[in-house]
């Protein structure tokens, strides 16, 4: 009983370790209701001012020389996504080496070499020589292109002491094959916000843009666990 239980236990441990390693190769799936991307509400609720019967009421004033752009915590900003990235790389290398050497011996242990070899009838010679050649060539190319367009409306999460706005938010779209997600977070200058309260994603500093999805369509674009094993660093070949 003990001889059979040890191999079975070893196989079980090896299987669990393999499953754990393969699961580590899987990219984390985005989930809804992430508290980090939840809408940020103003820290101090605005209290309704009492109506005193006057024409001009407190709390309803507007700046005659400005516009209604976001500049407070909880304000809303629409970010226009216009991301286009393209990268290409090529490398070529070639190395070659040729070598020729020869050694000629006219004496052995102080005695001259005879030219009459009684064995085989050939002359005796200890001359040696070799030729060597080595050539290495390599060629590599890589190209990648990405594009993301659209718009996401986010909220101001914080206002830095220098007036920079920290914004973040997300958009979930439920389709017939699953959910599509767009998340964005970064830093925005108030001067870069247009009069219609929009800002381009190219003007966001330290931008974190995520486009992902869940459902059948997202699952089919991911390789299975068996394929991930052959594509992982664990595969020795």
Curated annotation (Swiss-Prot):
Q: What does this protein do?
A: Assembles around the rod to form the L-ring and probably protects the motor/basal body from shearing forces during rotation.
Under the heading Pfam families, the entry gives: FlgH
Annotated membrane topology is: Lipid-anchor
Does the keyword Ubl conjugation feature in the UniProt annotation? no
PANTHER family (alphabetical): FLAGELLAR L-RING PROTEIN
Q: Where in the cell is it found?
A: Cell outer membrane; Bacterial flagellum basal body
A GO molecular function assigned to this protein is: cytoskeletal motor activity
Q: What is the lineage of its organism?
A: Bacteria, Pseudomonadati, Pseudomonadota, Gammaproteobacteria, Pseudomonadales
Family listed: Belongs to the FlgH family.
| Subunit organization | The basal body constitutes a major portion of the flagellar organelle and consists of four rings (L,P,S, and M) mounted on a central rod.
Q: Where are lipid groups covalently attached, annotated S-diacylglycerol cysteine? A: 25
Residues in the signal sequence: 1-24
What processes does the entry annotate via GO biological process terms?
A: bacterial-type flagellum-dependent cell motility
State which residue ranges cross the membrane.
Answer: none
| Tree of life domain | Bacteria
Q: What is this protein called?
A: Flagellar L-ring protein
Q: What species does this protein belong to?
A: Pseudomonas syringae pv. syringae (strain B728a)
User: Which HAMAP family does the annotation name?
Assistant: FlgH
Q: Where is lipid attached as N-palmitoyl cysteine?
A: 25
Keywords of the record: Bacterial flagellum, Cell outer membrane, Lipoprotein, Membrane, Palmitate, Signal
Say if the entry is tagged with keyword Lipoprotein: yes
| GO CC, alphabetical | bacterial-type flagellum basal body, distal rod, L ring; cell outer membrane
Query: Which PROSITE patterns does the protein's record reference?
Result: PROKAR_LIPOPROTEIN
């Amino acid at each position: 009983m003990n001889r059979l239980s040890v191999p079975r236990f070893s196989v079980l441990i090896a299987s669990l370790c393999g499953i754990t390693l393969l699961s580590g190769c899987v990219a984390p799936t985005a989930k809804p209701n992430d508290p980090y991307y939840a809408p940020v509400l103003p820290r101090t609720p605005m209290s309704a001012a009492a109506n005193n019967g006057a024409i001009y009421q407190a709390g309803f004033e507007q700046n005659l020389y400005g516009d209604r752009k976001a500049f407070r915590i909880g304000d809303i900003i629409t970010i226009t996504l216009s991301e286009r990235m393209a990268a290409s790389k090529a490398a070529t290398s070639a190395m070659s080496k040729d070598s020729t050497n020869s050694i000629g011996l006219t004496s052995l242990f102080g005695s001259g070499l005879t030219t009459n070899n009684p064995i085989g009838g050939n002359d005796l010679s200890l001359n040696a020589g070799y030729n060597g050649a080595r050539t290495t060539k390599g060629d590599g190319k890589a190209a990648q292109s990405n594009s993301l367009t659209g718009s996401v409306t986010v909220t101001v999460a914080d206002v830095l002491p220098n007036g920079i706005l920290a914004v973040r938010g997300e958009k979930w779209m439920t389709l017939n094959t699953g959910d599509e997600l767009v998340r964005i977070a970064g830093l925005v200058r108030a001067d870069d916000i247009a009069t219609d309260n929009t800002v381009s994603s190219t003007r966001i500093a330290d931008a974190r843009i995520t486009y992902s999805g869940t459902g059948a369509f997202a699952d089919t674009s991911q390789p299975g666990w068996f394929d991930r094993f052959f594509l992982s660093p664990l595969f020795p070949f």
